[in-house]
Amino acid sequence: MDPTPHGPFLVALDGQLTPVGRPALRFAWRGRGCEAVVSAGHITLAAQAGAVPYTIDRAALRPAAFAALEALPAELPEGWRLRLLPDHRVRLEHAMELEGTTTATALVSAMVGFALALDPYLDRLESAGMEAGIVKT
């Protein structure tokens, strides 16, 4: 029997998911937007981890925020990446291979593992004055 289309996936009888296009699952963790982008055998997980305080709002917190951003990459697990976006949002990313068959269980497991692993880094960013917040546009 042919795989059944379900949203951005083809689902085989054994539950294996085959991405069609570039599917992404979005979720929130501790008030932060997160995303899981799925490709064949891989998943890229990302979180908007915080934002550097604006000078107009909290200028005194900016030096600590930038110091934390400088130190944090050395503390991240292997394969993780920290990005400072042009609007001063901070993004944490992790790309990984999905072992075995890509199923809904494997995707949710990867998402939960990423969210739980984020906690100490979110704590670190918060202590340096970078909250989840909304970016001003």
Residue ranges and their predicted role:
Residues G50-R91:
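Short, internal acidic amphipathic alpha-helical interface segments
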Residues A110-A128:
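A conserved amphipathic terminal alpha-helix motif
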Residues D2-H6, R58, R62, L107:
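Generic alpha-helical secondary structure
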Residues R22-W29, L45-A47, L92-H94:
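Generic recognition of long tandem-repeat/solenoid scaffolds
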Residues A36-I56:
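A short acidic-to-branched-hydrophobic micro-motif
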Residues M1-A40, A74-G79, R83-L85:
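Charge-rich, low-complexity N-terminal segments
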